[in-house]
Every structure is written in C-alpha cells, then in structure tokens.
Curated annotation (Swiss-Prot):
GO terms for molecular function: 1-phosphatidylinositol-4-phosphate 5-kinase activity; ATP binding. This is Phosphatidylinositol 4-phosphate 5-kinase 9. It is found in: Membrane; Nucleus. Widely expressed. Residues 769-790 are annotated as: Activation loop. Its main location: membrane. MORN repeats lie at residues 58-80, 81-103, 104-126, 127-149, 150-172, 173-195, 196-218, 219-240. SMART domains: MORN, PIPKc. PANTHER family: PHOSPHATIDYLINOSITOL 5-PHOSPHATE 4-KINASE, ISOFORM A (PTHR23086:SF8), PHOSPHATIDYLINOSITOL-4-PHOSPHATE 5-KINASE (PTHR23086).
Amino acid sequence: MSGLDVRGAVSFAERTKSVDALTKKEILSALNSGEVSETSEDARFRVRELVLPDGESYSGSLLGNVPEGPGKYIWSDGCVYDGEWRRGMRHGIGNMRWASGASYDGEFSGGYMHGSGTYVDANKLTYKGRWRLNLKHGLGYQVYPNGDVFEGSWIQGLGEGPGKYTWANKNVYLGDMKGGKMSGKGTLTWVTGDSYEGSWLNGMMHGVGVYTWSDGGCYVGTWTRGLKDGKGSFYSAGTRVPVVQEFYLNALRKRGVLPDMRRQNQVASSVNMENLRVGVNRNKLSKGSLINLEQSRNGRVSLERRWSLEVSIEKVIGHGYSDLSTAVLDSGSSVQYKANIPILEREYMQGVLISELVVNNGFSRTSRRAKRKHKRLVKEAKKPGEVVIKGHRSYDLMLSLQLGIRYTVGKITPIQRRQVRTADFGPRASFWMTFPRAGSTMTPPHHSEDFKWKDYCPMVFRNLREMFKIDAADYMMSICGNDTLRELSSPGKSGSVFFLSQDDRFMIKTLRKSEVKVLLRMLPDYHHHVKTYENTLITKFFGLHRIKPSSGQKFRFVVMGNMFFTDLRIHRRFDLKGSSLGRSADKVEIDENTILKDLDLNYSFFLETSWREGLLRQLEIDSKFLEAQNIMDYSLLLGVHHRAPQHLRSQLVRSQSITTDALESVAEDDTIEDDMLSYHEGLVLVPRGSENTVTGPHIRGSRLRASAVGDEEVDLLLPGTARLQIQQGVNMPARAELIPGREDKEKQILHDCCDVVLYLGIIDILQEYNMTKKIEHAYKSLHFDSLSISAVDPTFYSQRFLEFIKKVFPQNNKS
C-alpha cells in the first residue's frame, strides 16, 4: 500500500502557465473569434475564449495579463482545468481532468492541490481527504482498485501515523503506519479469526507481540522480521492465561509496548470521512502538477503470512503434549479451561525452535517465580538503553545536540562540494553559534536552556559522510527526527555518555577535552587513511561538536557509525584488547547487551581462508596506523549472531513430518517451507544479487569472494531475511568452536560447534600513550606482570593485539 507520489517539481513558470506572458495588447489581438468585455476600472477583462499560439486556450477572467477569478484553461494534450485563479495560478475551488482519465476535485493553493479534495486516477483508485503541496497530507480515505481500503493519517504522500487498512478479503489492520507500511504498534485480524497484536516494522511482526488463534490458543513472545526470535510462552486451546501473564500484557499496553485497542478504536472512529468537506461545485488544478500525479506507485501492504507454517506446527506440537480432546468442546459451546494443560516455554532463533520447557499451568497470583519470569521478559523486550524523554537528566542536552546538528547540516549542505583542503583541518576550522531559548535571526526558538554550539571541521566530516554514502537528510532524520535518542550506560571506565539514534544507525559519545585534541591532531591522517583503505575497520567518525549550556559544563560529542546496525540479533558482544589483567566482565547476570572481555571469550571463529587473510591484513594495516599516531588502549569490538546448532535442526524436520496432515487446512506461502529447510545446510552463500540486498549504512569497499562459488562475490542468505551483503567486518559468516577447557566460563547459549554471523571493528582510538599512561604502566608493572596490563607502549600494544586476534580467528583447516 502506498499513496500517490505527486511530488510537484513544478517551476513557477509551469504553475503560472497560462496567459501571463502576453501583454494586454497581445491578448486583444489574439481574439480572432472571441470577445473581451471590460468588467471594471481595474483592468479586469472577461474573456469568452482566448486561443494561444501553441493551440492552448483560456476563457474566464483576467486581471492585467494573468488569470484572476473563475476561468477555464485547456492544454493542447487534452488536460482541462476549470476553477478559480489568483495571480495566474490555480487557487481556490477547482476541477482538473487529465487526458489519461484521472481527475481531481477540490481545493488549490498557489498552483498546488492543497486543502481538501478527491482524486480518482485512471485505474479508479480513489482518494478523498487532505492535501498539501500536491501530496496527501492529513486525514484521508483511499480505496484501491482491488477493493482494499485505507483510512487514517497521511504524511508527504504516504500512510503515516494511526490508521486502519482493510483488505478486500476482510482482513483488518488497526494501528501505526510508517512510510506506507505497518510499523509501530498495531493489531492485524484475519478473517479466519486469528490475530496478532504487538510491534511491527516495515510490514512485518517485529518486537513483542501476542499471536492468538481462532481456537483460543496464543503465543506471547518476540519476533524479528516476521519470525519468532527469543523467549516466549505458548498457551494451547483450553489453557487459561495466568493472572500474572494478563497483568504483564496490560502493563505492556500501558507502557506502549503493545497496542492499546481502546486508543486505536478512538483514533479509528475519529477518522470520519464524512467530515472532510470537498467543494465539488467548481472544477480545478495545474498541469505542471498533473504530470507527476500520473506517476503513482503500486506498493501495497503485504499480507503474506510468512509465519503461518510455523504457526501450524506449533498448534500440533502443543496439542501433542496433552489430550486436548478433553479441553476442546463441541462447536458452539463455551470454552472450558483445564488447569492441568501444560504451558510451553520456548526459545527461538530466527524462527527455529531451539529449546522447549513444559510447565504446569499452576501459577498463583503471588508466585515469586512467575513474577521474576515476567519481569525478565519485560527486560528482554526492551531495546538497549534508556529512552530520553522530558524529565530525563539528559533531556536538555539531547535537545541542544539535535538542534545543533540540524543547524550544522542545514548550513553546510547547500555549499558546493569540493575537495578537502588543509585549511579545513585543525581547531581553527570551526565555527560558533549561540542558541538563545527565545530564538534569534539565525536560530529558531527551542525548549532547552540557552547554549553555545561549536562545530569542528564541518567540511571534513561532511566529506567523510559523503564518502560512506550517508545522505544529509537521512543523517538529520536519524539523529534529529521526531524520535528521541536512547542513552546507553557506559560499558567502560571512561564515564562517557553514549546516545543511540532510534533507528540504531548512529552512536553519539561524549569525549574528554584531551580526546578531542587527539582527534583534531590525527584527523588529516585519519581522513587520508579512511580514503585510502576503503575496507578499514577503524571507527567511522561523522561529526565532532561541543555544547556549552549557559549554566553548566561543556560537553564534547563525536558522532560515529554503529557497528551493530543490523536486522540480525546480536547475541554476544566482546571488547577484545589482547591484555589479561582485569579483562573479564564483572556482571553476574549476562545478557545480550553485556560487553564481555578477553577472558570471557570461550570460542574460536573459523573463517574462509581468504577472508581470514584479508581480515588479518586489514587489522595489521589499521593497527600500524594507530601505532604511528602514538595510540594505544584500542580494542576490537566483536558482535556475534548465532544460528540454530546442527543437532537441533533435525528436531525441525521431525516436527514438520508430524504436521503434514494439519498443514493441509492452512493457507500458506509455499516459499516458507523451503526457507526453513535451508537451515539444515547452515549458512547459505549465493552469488551476489543486484536487488533486495541489505547493505550496512556506513559500508565502503568491495564485497568478499568465496571459493565455494568459483571465487565470485557472494551474499549471505538467511531464512526470514533479505540477502545480506558480505564485506570486511560486516555480515561475515563463520563457524564457532568451543575452546577446550573453557566450557564453564559462562552459561552456554552456543553449542560445541555452530554457525555464526560476525560484526567487528576497531574502537576507542583516541587514547595517546602520554605521560599519564606511562606512569600507569610503571606503577602497575610493580604489582602485576607488565605484559598483561593494557597500558603499554603503542608498538608492543599493536603486536600483542594482532597476536591475540590471530588466536581468535585461527587458521581454518577444514576449508
């Protein structure tokens, strides 16, 4: 589903395309058979018919030499506008008819469809609602040629915000939309009686949700891109959902994690199309806008139930654990709940069932175990970080940061692109701007306190953003859009504050003054290094700024690319330096957001031989660069996404064989079975594709090649996801094997050998080996092994770092 994209790239001349180029004398001479009557002393004429030299004609009122008041304009290609004019542009109530058969009836302003109006295209797609500058904007009601209907909020030509989409087959979605797709919180109800309420992303179930079948069974858990992913609970038909679970679901609705049906119904009822008054007694519109109006997009909300195969399997498996013949009554009778029917606690990995625990339906209201379980589920459902909202300690700081970045990018983007010069580097290549709360001639009013904004080397960072193909508008929307940032707890000892953009593309970190000086000093060499080595694994920097509130300390920020921006779930995160002193996580409870360290790593990762050689070569180049800059204390940030282990894939095969008969009664997408069966082969590499390939937002360089497909460039194909582009440090498939003797280091979620996808890069590259670090080295060497501490000179640090990384990625003798 998508709205018509009528982006009016209409010039002023096109919007006034009529008789404004003719003088009054020429108008009179053009009237071969028409008539002109003087209607007032202000030179207003009433033209019966004026034939222009190019074959187009106008009849109506003129003021001077432009249309003013009611008039009709006919273009040479058959397009007709009949309605009100002002200063030569369509303005007021009017009707426009295209040669293709499309028409618009409604309000115009300044030559654009603007206000309330009804548009019908040549294929009988009908939209009735609000317009803004030729785009659907506001409340609107659209009927598609196939009978689908969407009513709700539109922004810039696309469904955005609360709305209701009804398919021709009577399936209904009620909830949030974004970019014309189901995104946010919403409920989809099928005509069969099944329903899903929860979070959506790009038209797919994504996040916490509840899937309920028509027979009363339900699954409460998390999804990733349409597939179950993580822990959840399955309640078969006839099972009463525990009171604690009901409290948990209600709490999620209050917090906005699940959709609030009462609120959605209120929103839906408020979208009353009868209240959208559209004037139809006059006809109007401009030709320049019409051409773009024809270019409608055919994208629509996808209703393919790509999860329904596993749903059917789940039904049968769940029924297999208990005699449901005693729980399911004859049709038409009320449901009876059986306390002895078990509840299935399950864990999935990207749609694959990896563990299952049968528990008795005997939760009490005051069960401590149940409360702990649901408190843990709520914690797992949350995104990493703390949402910065009004009242948060960092709220004013976030507002100032967003306002400053918006100002900086808006100021520098119009400047013509050019090569970076020597004068663009250094502390002097910066500018100040004061942002008073009430606003100024240069800055808008805002809700934060007065502050001063300093932007360092804006031309250099603009060049870096362009180098990584980051669009200026996307950059601003990601950091400074309507969504707030999330504050992350500092994983290290620096005490830095970390912000994460809501779309997870960018990290923002506070820096010490000394770190800013280091970055400015090394920025020319950093820029040259990144430009020369497009596969570099060093942190990508996109902006350096400083905020000085009117009352308070200075804050210095650097904007970086998030190395873990991916649709795949990062199950483990490691910060690896090669040292051993104090290099283990001190958290008792380890979750997916815990940053583990060198001594916590109990797996080796085996890559294809050529990939390993390329990775180690690039790491050596990068570490030598940092050594030349007198930098130490950096680390390799490693993210691990793991797939289902081999021995569990056979369980899926057995489950599918059990459910052969049951699947016949469910309408499925035939491709799903093939997708799920592909797990048996582990990670699948396919020759590179030109379409539907997901790339990272900050990726440069060539793709990796695989000997298995004739040394061609390859993509990674995973069930339930798009093709992932494999590059150095991004979407790298590997085999993880347990290191002997390290089995009990942490609770194992991986197995002895399993498939993984790796994400990695070098971070924390702003620590010089200065006098402070030299003193730290001397002091710690008196108490500990000098080779085990982090504070060592850059040359030794680089050597030790590379030796350790070689052990993490040993030579693959099986490839």
